Amino acid sequence: MDPKYQRVELNDGHFMPVLGFGTYAPPEVPRNRAVEVTKLAIEAGFRHIDSAYLYNNEEQVGLAIRSKIADGSVKREDIFYTSKLWCTFFQPQMVQPALESSLKKLQLDYVDLYLLHFPMALKPGETPLPKDENGKVIFDTVDLSATWEVMEKCKDAGLAKSIGVSNFNCRQLEMILNKPGLKYKPVCNQVECHPYLNQSKLLDFCKSKDIVLVAHSALGTQRHKLWVDPNSPVLLEDPVLCALAKKHKQTPALIALRYQLQRGVVVLAKSYNEQRIRENIQVFEFQLTSEDMKVLDGLNRNYRYVVMDFLMDHPDYPFSDEY
């Protein structure tokens, strides 16, 4: 089997490609760019495509996937597509309609994976960040166990092959896992993860529960002012990462991606640059030594780029716990 189609078995028996293509772009990037880059990614060999309601690009990403199916490049079952339920749709009665709305935009019959995007419910409705007259985000109180039950129904209905969570801490994962009458465990927890925030404790916990850790922001984010402090350290300029890149004749990005794969983490590579999209798929063509891995482990400083500080007051804000 072509190494670039390596997959990991999920706890529900489905398989997820270990390298994914992240489609998020800041609002100023024209939406139709998502069509081009998703097609490029599929042509380069990516089979795992990650999007979300919040990214506001599912029509474009769906169009790209369908056009690569139509031209015979791939079959639908070759593609592993992830979408995410946004926090304003966590009221149980809103979950399935939100997924159906995503499917309608995508013009697909099912998603391979549907995630709770963040563990924080916000005021219901179409506005992603509903604010009061003082500009403060309006929270909602929802029992996420009840939201999860409807996620399970979406899986049973065949609208989502697998269901999981994103940006949950250990305590929040346990809450779902210990839920009375749990039918399906989350197959994964997609979290920020890179050499500066290697999530080793959360990774160990997830492995112990047969939950896959999926790394977003694996290259240190796009550093967009909406989400990230402009003074934050630039991961891909890290001297240790650059020295390893030189040693292996690879890019620093490839070292950061390879690091995750060798730890058993599924990794998302986000790029809207054609050359880098093609480069990133080369992550399967080299290996890091155990010494290299130790050196990379040593870069951890529990540094989080995506802090979401405007939600810090939320009772379910996930990043105050150690992991």
UniProtKB/Swiss-Prot annotation:
Reaction(s) the record says it catalyses: a 3alpha-hydroxysteroid + NADP(+) = a 3-oxosteroid + NADPH + H(+); a 3alpha-hydroxysteroid + NAD(+) = a 3-oxosteroid + NADH + H(+); 5alpha-androstane-3alpha,17beta-diol + NADP(+) = 17beta-hydroxy-5alpha-androstan-3-one + NADPH + H(+); 5alpha-androstane-3beta,17beta-diol + NADP(+) = 17beta-hydroxy-5alpha-androstan-3-one + NADPH + H(+)
Record protein name field: Aldo-keto reductase family 1 member C4
Subcellular location: Cytoplasm, Cytosol
Post-translational modification: The N-terminus is blocked.
Gene: AKR1C4
Presence of keyword Oxidoreductase: yes
Assigned EC number: 1.1.1.-, 1.1.1.209, 1.1.1.210, 1.1.1.51
Keywords per UniProt: Cytoplasm, Lipid metabolism, NADP, Oxidoreductase
Site residues, Lowers pKa of active site Tyr: K84
Active site: Y55 (proton donor)
GO cellular component, as recorded: cytoplasm; cytosol; extracellular exosome
Primary location: cytoplasm
SUPFAM superfamilies for the chain: NAD(P)-linked oxidoreductase
Organism for this UniProt entry: Homo sapiens (Human)
Activity regulation comment: Inhibited by nonsteroidal the anti-inflammatory drugs (NSAID) flufenamic. The oxidation reaction is inhibited by low micromolar concentrations of NADPH.
